Amino acid sequence: MIGTRLPAWTRVLACGVAGLSLMTISAKAEDVITLGASVQLSGPVANTGRYYQDAYNITIDKINAAGGVKVDGKPYKLALKIYDNQSNVNLSVRQYTQLVTTDKVNFLLGPFASNFALADSVISEKYRIPMVQGGGASDEIYSRNFKYIFGTLAPASNYFGSTVEMLKGLDPKVTNVALVYADDSFDISVADGTRKLLKDAGFTIAADEKFATNSTDFTSLISQIKSKNVDAVLVAGHETEVLNFVRQSKSLAFDPKLYSFTVGVPTEDFRKALGKDANYAFGMTAWLPSADLKDRWFGDAAKFETEYKARFNYEPDYHAASGASDVEAFAEAIEKANSLDPQKVRDALASIKFDSLYGPIAFDKQGQINLPQIVVQVQDGKLVEIRGPAGQVNPPQYPMPAWNAR
């Protein structure tokens, strides 16, 4: 039998857990609770990584301004220790190890992207320091029976769930669908779930294609899909991949009735990067600032958006809202546990229920929340909510006109 050598980060749990001195990290004399994180601040996905750094900072500052977090009647300030993992998962794992063993942070906030959360959560599990992360949605993260990882993104397998429901009622009818996805943990989970959703809904999957993560050239893939005469294209990828897919679709005059993307569409950057070519693109989000979501620290989602944009000079999207709720989850759990003991805070996280600017937070047995995805579309340069949890909100612009008819 030939064994498969596992990546270094998958072997961490096997290394010396027995005899490990578990840390109950107390606050220092300055009464500070330190949250540690490794985030993509440079490299291919830095544009999304910044949401997490900025969300962590603004939320920590907001909680501190309101008096901090109380433990046994004593107020503690929150602090952030953050590293740039340069979009390198192996570096991220080393940095989380450093945060726990050298920096001795109290608790961990997550990185962006499922492959990072999948790897980095091995560190939180090994050292039994809870991590709350809002950057990874892959079902694989929560399938390992880990006890110290909690996530505020809904399961990737159902990301296109609301979109498939919308497809059922479109006129002209959608029959043939292309499913396109990147070769990484998140996008594979999306594809696996979407494949079943499409089949159960009676759609024909005319193309089912995987591309290499961080691909820049989609011409061959688009040409292949174009030859299938599909009605709709569902793409699971990251923002740069999505931008390149749209640009190259235009250059190849590929104009299905509809295309929808897992990421990018809700962001201001997407609309700025593509200009008028962003129109008609569908996407999804678990959060909109217009939602009626009340919050203990910011007041509501709209106030969070206003403060975030004023401070960082760009609009927050669901990544930022999710990151903010991660910090809030720790504040709630620490106060519920009335302790800084990692095990007690972990147990409190497993049972907390509270309203955040992002939505209601309550973790299931696997450590994940389940918020419905909202279908959005770019219409005349603006982001429009098309379908919410209760059904259609605004009419979609469908079918998408040919590129030469715009």
Swiss-Prot record:
GO BP annotations listed: amino acid transport
Residues of the signal peptide: 1-29
Pfam families with a match to the protein in the record: Peripla_BP_6
Keywords, sorted A to Z: Amino-acid transport, Signal, Transport
Source organism superkingdom: Bacteria
Free-text function comment from the UniProt entry: Component of an amino-acid transport system.
Keyword check for Plastid: no
SUPFAM superfamilies on file: Periplasmic binding protein-like I (SSF53822)
Family the UniProt entry places it in: Belongs to the leucine-binding protein family.
InterPro entries: BCAA_transport, Leu-bd, Peripla_BP_I
Record protein name field: Leu/Ile/Val-binding protein homolog 5
